[in-house]
Amino acid sequence: MKLAYWMYAGPAHIGTLRVASSFKNVHAIMHAPLGDDYFNVMRSMLERERDFTPVTASIVDRHVLARGSQNKVVDNITRKDKEERPDLIVLTPTCTSSILQEDLQNFVNRASMNSNSDVILADVNHYRVNELQAADRTLEQVVRFYIEKAKNNNDLDLIKTTKPSANIIGIFTLGFHNQHDCRELKRLLQDLGIQINEVIPEGGSVSNLKKLPKAWFNLVPYREVGLMTAIYLEKEFKMPYVSTTPMGVVDTGSCIKEIENIINSYTQDKISYDEYIDKQTRFVSQAAWFSRSIDCQNLTGKKAVVFGDATHAASMTRILSKEMGIYVICAGTYCTHDADWFKEQVQGYCDEVLITDNHTEVGDLIARVEPAAIFGTQMERHIGKRLNIPCGVISAPVHIQNFPLGYRPFLGYEGTNQIADLVYNSFTLGMEDHLLEIFGGHDTKEVITKGLSTDSELRWTSESENELRKIPGFVRGKIKRNTEKFARQNNVTEITVEIMYAAKEAMNA
């Protein structure tokens, strides 16, 4: 356990609550002390939904510590059963309340006797896994519970649909542009003549989970959530799944070809989506011709750093490198549990790979390599602001501006257009900045400081500061840093104009 003011992936119970609150008519009860119950506020603030978050906190207070939690937890479950009449109630502790080592499964068994709803305890180790791993596990647990229940009741529907159909697994609340991606995936599958069987967990009903085996295959757009469920369904019903994320022109084409192979394995009448892929790539997606335009060629060779969850960071790295000719100096992910897969995906597309969930390491790396742009999470956006480096947000965790009301998918062919816009608009055009400084429009009185840590031992003279102001803004920060680095190496505490020129000569040598 470590103290941090920023975490890329939250504690396990947040993942469980995200899955539970994504389903329709499912209620979650969180057995937690005050302070752990921030999920309701977070979801209400970020997700642009009209419904209340279906999560109740069963607070661990001094009375509970004195008498035990059983009565309070059981009462909360039975009360919510009567008030809300949900199909399912999910009970989850937090890492704090887990310290009490209570037999919560016994509480669930007791509450089930007096409830019309199904009641389950989230089967998650709160000390070993993070938010994303817990979400993946909880989704698989809920699916398994209802598949087993349908088997016992002999009403499991195993007859495949007449037309090709798919389940989309892993779209859930607080995901990065998940709602928009879901719409784009539905449109893509519809274009391919494939029906949507179920979308889970977002907007799905637990009573329909027994219909999952009717689909011809499962589509898992994000590795972080849904993969365990797809593997379970493959093992149980021999259902194939596609886990290639359709992000970018190349990977969207690869995903469609995988779907084509699966459908052809079911039917005698072979189909080909080559014509569709060609048409979409050349005429519908603007990204392919844009990448060959003079605007995009101006970005060729520019340095970028990519950091985010494994799915988005790996896809973005390949898009920048393969499709846009941008030099990815470092690609990284905070999904430390998926490090091997990530390294395999970005191999050959970047110079350096960073696997860490410590934001200070990411900040230090960005300050060291000085990229022209960053593509990361909300945290990298903060780092970019401090270093005056533009940042495009491509992965959760994100803030309110990345829950847009307008249609902004990152997957499919429309997603390629969004990504092309994001990439192009993220890079600062040096001449534009320079002209703004010459003709006005920016406050250029203060020298821009680029550095994560302030160096108080170095002092710039007024003459050297005036000299620094004459340098164009798009290279000024770099020259300032190089001069300060030279001064430290030579034990100089006061930076004069002469030191600036000496530093320049040393760099050119």
Curated annotation (Swiss-Prot):
Residue numbers binding [4Fe-4S] cluster: D36
Enzyme Commission (EC) number: 1.3.7.7
Cofactor binding mode and count: Binds 1 [4Fe-4S] cluster per heterodimer. The cluster is bound at the heterodimer interface by residues from both subunits.
Annotated catalysed reactions: chlorophyllide a + oxidized 2[4Fe-4S]-[ferredoxin] + 2 ADP + 2 phosphate = protochlorophyllide a + reduced 2[4Fe-4S]-[ferredoxin] + 2 ATP + 2 H2O
Database matches in CDD domains: Pchlide_reductase_B
GO molecular function: 4 iron, 4 sulfur cluster binding; ATP binding; metal ion binding; oxidoreductase activity, acting on iron-sulfur proteins as donors; oxidoreductase activity, acting on the CH-CH group of donors, iron-sulfur protein as acceptor
Top-level EC class as recorded in UniProt: oxidoreductase
Listed GO CC annotations: chloroplast
Cellular location(s): Plastid, Chloroplast
Keywords, in A-Z order: 4Fe-4S, ATP-binding, Chlorophyll biosynthesis, Chloroplast, Iron, Iron-sulfur, Metal-binding, Nucleotide-binding, Oxidoreductase, Photosynthesis, Plastid
Pathway: Porphyrin-containing compound metabolism; chlorophyll biosynthesis (light-independent)
Gene3D superfamilies listed in its UniProt record: 1.20.89.20, Nitrogenase molybdenum iron protein domain, Proto-chlorophyllide reductase 57 kD subunit B
Predominant subcellular localization, coarse grouping: plastid
Active-site residues per Swiss-Prot or TrEMBL entry: D295 (proton donor)
InterPro entries in alphabetical order: ChlB/BchB/BchZ (IPR050152), LI-POR_suB-like_C (IPR013580), Nase/OxRdtase_comp1 (IPR000510), P-CP_red_C (IPR042298), Protochl_reductB (IPR005969), Protochlorophyllide_Rdtase (IPR016209)
Membrane-crossing segments per the record: none
Its biological purpose: Component of the dark-operative protochlorophyllide reductase (DPOR) that uses Mg-ATP and reduced ferredoxin to reduce ring D of protochlorophyllide (Pchlide) to form chlorophyllide a (Chlide). This reaction is light-independent. The NB-protein (ChlN-ChlB) is the catalytic component of the complex.
Family (UniProt): Belongs to the ChlB/BchB/BchZ family.
Subunit structure: Protochlorophyllide reductase is composed of three subunits; ChlL, ChlN and ChlB. Forms a heterotetramer of two ChlB and two ChlN subunits.
Record-given protein name: Light-independent protochlorophyllide reductase subunit B
Encoding gene per record: chlB
